[in-house]
Amino acid sequence: MAKELRFGDDARQQMLAGVNALADAVKATMGPSGRNVVLERSFGAPTVTKDGVSVAKEIEFENRFKNMGAQMVKEVAAKTSDTAGDGTTTATVLARAIVVEGHKAVAAGMNPMDLKRGIDKAVAAVTKKLQEMSKPCKDGKAIAQVGTISANSDQAIGSIIAEAMEKVGKEGVITVEDGNSLENELAVVEGMQFDRGYISPYFINNQQNMSAELEHPFILLVDKKISTIRDMLSVLEAVAKSGPSLLIIAEDVEGEALATLVVNNMRGIVKVCAVKAPGFGDRRKAMLQDIAILTAGEVISEEVGTSLESATLDSLGTAKRVVVTKENTTIIDGEGKAADINARITQIRAQMEETTSDYDREKLQERVAKLAGGVAVIKLVLLPNRMKRKARVEDALHATRAAVEEGIVAGGGVALIRAQKALDGLKGENADQDMGINILRRAIESPLRQIVANAGYEPSVIVNKVAESKDNFGFNAATGEYGDMVEMGILDPTKVTRTALQNAASVASLMLTTECMVADLPKKEEPMGAGEMGGMGGMGGMGGMM
């Protein structure tokens, strides 16, 4: 396919046009007084949003070179969202500010590579300063404040996220679902829960809750199908003599084995329940091993040379209580050793760092949560705009996790203004690198300027006043008041601010050092002309039909 090329300043101008157009749309949503953006939908009513990344995802341009610039900034927003869960608008505004100032310097004849080196040096200094300024986010009040700010000042969301994190801990999994009531609800699942229920309803012993409840059960873990009762006779006899109940977790239990277990359960010989093992393939094996460590048992598997016929009570795990419903199994207070569980968590975390798949990382995080803390489910109030609200809660959840991970700094753009001090006295190796440092110095004022502008105030006046002040003194755009941002509950996760700055500077530097752009030439569609009808030959033989 034929290509179209752009070089030098022409290429950068086209990119800059795309960056400006996308940033103009996204920046309108920034801050507590951010404006709404209306997005057209193919079907139904348009969507109204204040979420910067949602706006960015919708934007594409017909001009391919302009579109490349926009897509690169869109990548900044997406990467920041993936890493820190928030800060997409901040990253977009910062990237635009660096690109605009940098483009002026390149147009004036400065060396793009030296500008990049100066910007990188300044980013490293500002990042270090942010980490020095960061304070740990430990108490529920700070977590609630971070969640509230990220959820566009919705205090109900901030409070319920803080409550959820308090109950399941920072390692716990918190999920968001649509509720059926008129109030937000928080449901906490204690212990390890997986999405497999009883194989047969004849295992139910609590008719009111339609569940099988086992107190102090032995837990048999088998990595294969169980079809014949002969394989597990020795285990059943041992449990019948010394244990009150038995939970069997296997790939499947069927045929004669299932029928015998049901009969034994109904006659009261052995209180038993059988469930299928969670997951599939290698993930099933890993989750069975998790359960084994949690309950101080072992997985009966031919791969490691153990068989069901030779299993003894020592092979079985134990727990304080197990509740099995039609859809879920919950193991409460497994008897596993804390040291073994912590070692398993460390091992899974190492796998999380190595994997490149977001899906795999999410599943590994769920396994950590089930071993370490628990699972909390936030059920949202039934409202017409619940999809928009659900996205807002998920953003706030990511922000609070980031705050717990790396701490918090003063919000509202104040932390970046304070971090400017790290650039005082910082020098590059030449004048062009010094210009790169100054470009970043001016660019990190842009988030505060945009927040103030969206609130309807004069940015220059407020930025100067905040810059001349100390510590956490800043401007509350929601109320129009000056004061201590931390005391006013306006906080940003350090990770969000740091990630937004680093990603913005990285992509902006790429743009400034771009010398050529290559795009496909659009295909010219041929006009659909009327084809020749041709003759009606071959009709002469129809005379014989007379």
Swiss-Prot record:
Organism superkingdom: Bacteria
Binding site for ATP: 29-32, 50, 86-90, 412, 476-478, 492
Enzyme Commission number(s) from the entry: 5.6.1.7
InterPro entries referenced in this protein's UniProt entry, alphabetically: Chaperonin_Cpn60_CS, Cpn60/GroEL, Cpn60/GroEL/TCP-1, GroEL-like_apical_dom_sf, GROEL-like_equatorial_sf, TCP-1-like_intermed_sf
Upregulation: Not induced by heat shock.
CC terms in the record's Gene Ontology section: cytoplasm
Localisation: Cytoplasm
UniProt cross-references to SUPFAM superfamilies, sorted A to Z: GroEL apical domain-like (SSF52029), GroEL equatorial domain-like (SSF48592), GroEL-intermediate domain like (SSF54849)
An individual GO BP term: protein refolding
Molecular function terms, GO-annotated: ATP binding; ATP-dependent protein folding chaperone; isomerase activity; unfolded protein binding
Quaternary structure, from the entry: Forms a cylinder of 14 subunits composed of two heptameric rings stacked back-to-back. Interacts with the co-chaperonin GroES.
Descriptive protein name: Chaperonin GroEL
Organism lineage string: Bacteria, Pseudomonadati, Pseudomonadota, Gammaproteobacteria, Legionellales
